[in-house]
């Protein structure tokens, strides 16, 4: 996926959220401390770290869900935030359609619902019950719900949790495309080390505090990163920097970089404008897998 510079040379920085020396203290210990980060319009910033490193805590501070016990958190005035939590308290066994999920936090015009579902590639699932969605489809529905309110920034807490490998690649590709299409900022947290690296502009590595930060290449070459994740976490980065000019949508269509779509050629994994070969040794950003007798599912 092509990355866009968040602030080209000479352009004023448009900071949406900023944390300075922020920390949260609970039950006699610091959950996370000394966090410095900012997210600008059009920028993807990713929090990585092992379980318990403070990623969700830092994200909740950024959202003003948690008040910092030290330091400060500031938002741009009038900031609109779209939030996709790590866990959502919805009983998916109860009747709940995708379009109804979209309006749980408040009414939305029909055209906004339709546009958001189309943007994330699941317009064909508007009437579907959430209980029947795959993990990737449900995550897309949650992203659509956040996107429909036209946020300045999207905060995504472990957005690929419970999604298999090809689904993870597809969701990271989608996140980058939504950033490119809307110009919003993105703050996401992930325990993934490689797929996410190809989808982000800046990385903040947490382990109770900020271990290191910078571009993906800066972070993966940092001694602190290697100490935390081991040298095995460095080598495969380049594998995920191989990209195509297309994305496969869950409804079977092919979306190209110029915004056009096409139906795939029968018996092929690509449309008429390009080629995909899984045997070439690269991991591809396909957004579906095939199931017997059903729609492709992300």
From Swiss-Prot:
Keywords recorded for this protein, A-Z: ATP-binding, Cell inner membrane, Cell membrane, Ion transport, Membrane, Nucleotide-binding, Translocase, Transport, Zinc, Zinc transport
Recorded family membership: Belongs to the ABC transporter superfamily. Zinc importer (TC 3.A.1.15.5) family.
Location of the region described as Disordered in the Swiss-Prot/TrEMBL record: 273-298
Segments forming domain ABC transporter: 17-232
Subcellular location, record wording: Cell inner membrane
Topology versus the membrane: Peripheral membrane protein
Catalyzed reactions per annotation: Zn(2+)(out) + ATP(in) + H2O(in) = Zn(2+)(in) + ADP(in) + phosphate(in) + H(+)(in)
Protein function: Part of the ABC transporter complex ZnuABC involved in zinc import. Responsible for energy coupling to the transport system.
Name of the featured protein: Zinc import ATP-binding protein ZnuC
Residues engaged in binding ATP: 49-56
Quaternary assembly: The complex is composed of two ATP-binding proteins (ZnuC), two transmembrane proteins (ZnuB) and a solute-binding protein (ZnuA).
Molecular function in Gene Ontology: ABC-type zinc transporter activity; ATP binding; ATP hydrolysis activity
């Amino acid at each position: 996926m092509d990355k866009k510079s968040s602030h080209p040379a000479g352009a004023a920085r448009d900071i949406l959220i900023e944390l300075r020396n922020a920390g949260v203290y609970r039950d006699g210990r610091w959950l996370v401390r000394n966090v410095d980060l900012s997210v600008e319009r059009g920028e993807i910033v990713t929090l990585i770290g092992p379980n318990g490193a403070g990623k969700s805590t830092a994200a909740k501070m950024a959202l003003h869900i948690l008040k910092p016990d030290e330091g400060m958190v500031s938002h741009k005035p009038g900031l609109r935030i779209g939030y996709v939590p790590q866990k959502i308290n919805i009983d998916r066994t109860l009747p709940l359609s995708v379009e109804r999920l979209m309006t749980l936090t408040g009414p939305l015009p029909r055209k906004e619902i339709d546009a958001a579902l189309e943007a994330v590639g699941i317009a064909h699932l508007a009437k579907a019950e959430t209980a029947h969605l795959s993990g990737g489809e449900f995550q897309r529905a949650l992203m659509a719900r956040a996107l429909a309110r036209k946020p300045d920034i999207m905060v995504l807490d472990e957005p690929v949790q419970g999604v298999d490998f090809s689904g993870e690649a597809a969701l990271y590709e989608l996140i980058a495309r939504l950033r490119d299409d809307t110009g919003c900022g993105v703050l996401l947290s992930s325990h993934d080390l490689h797929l996410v690296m190809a989808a982000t502009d800046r990385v903040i590595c947490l382990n109770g505090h900020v271990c290191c930060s910078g571009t993906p290449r800066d972070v993966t070459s940092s001694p602190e990163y290697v100490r935390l994740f081991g040298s095995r976490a460095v080598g495969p980065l380049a594998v995920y920097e191989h990209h195509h000019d297309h994305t496969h949508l869950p409804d079977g269509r092919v979306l190209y970089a110029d915004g056009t779509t096409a139906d795939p050629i029968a018996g092929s994994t690509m449309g008429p404008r390009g080629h995909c070969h899984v045997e070439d040794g690269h991991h591809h950003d396909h957004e579906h897998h095939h199931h017997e007798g059903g729609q492709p599912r992300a």
